[in-house]
Design a protein with these regions (language model features):
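N-terminal secretory signal peptides that target proteins for export/translocation
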Residues: 1-8
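Beta-strand-enriched cores of mature, soluble protein domains
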Residues: 27-184
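Bacterial N-terminal signal peptides
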Residues: 11-25
Length: 184
């Protein structure tokens, strides 16, 4: 009986050590693959290409809007896993009362090598009216990297964004930061 318990204990110890080393190796490899992203995009590189606004009619200023944004990226502004991002198309919709409320969307980053990265966006916009009557619209949200093509098929990640925008003037500028990893 004593001999059996020693064998059982040895086997159990070997299994625990193996599992621990395996989990440590997986966690270490996963952590090594995470890459940081941080960039700012000035207003002249983004524009609303389409906007369709419908008044809801329940309260003044309540509108639903479908929009499309095109962004161009100059050399070396945004590089993902060694490949330069050339442009981005974002298509989304918002549910605003006087430019306050939620917005959602879907985006595609096009890379220099022809690959694409797909994104989902959600967040909230807030309009602040200054004493002089001028207005500042700020969108704060989260972008989820949700796969892609070619080299970026397994890309995942999260970016936080803050964007200043004026849908009437077509102006958009902002900053993005977060991290991504590519699952094999």
């Amino acid at each position: 009986m004593k001999k059996f318990m020693l064998k059982g204990t040895s086997v159990l110890l070997a299994v625990i050590v193996s599992a621990g080393l395996t989990l440590f190796g997986i966690a270490e490899a996963w952590a090594q693959q995470k890459q940081k992203i941080s960039y700012k995009l000035p207003a002249e590189l983004s524009k609303f290409t389409q906007q369709h606004v419908i008044d809801v009619g329940d309260v003044p200023g309540h509108q639903v809007r479908i929009f499309e944004v095109h962004r161009t990226y100059p050399k070396d502004l945004l590089v993902v896993d060694g490949v330069r991002v050339v442009e981005e198309w974002l298509r989304g919709y918002s549910d605003y009362i006087d430019t306050n409320g939620p917005a959602w969307g879907y985006g595609i980053y096009s890379l220099e090598n022809g690959d694409k990265i797909f994104t989902r966006l959600h967040g909230t916009s807030q309009a602040i009216v200054h004493p002089d009557g001028s207005k500042k619209n700020t969108f704060t949200g989260v972008i989820t990297l949700a796969g892609g093509t070619g080299k970026f098929r397994g890309i995942l990640g999260t970016l936080r964004t803050m964007v200043i925008f004026d849908p009437k003037a077509g102006v958009i500028e902002g900053q993005w930061e977060g991290e991504y990893w590519i699952e094999k």
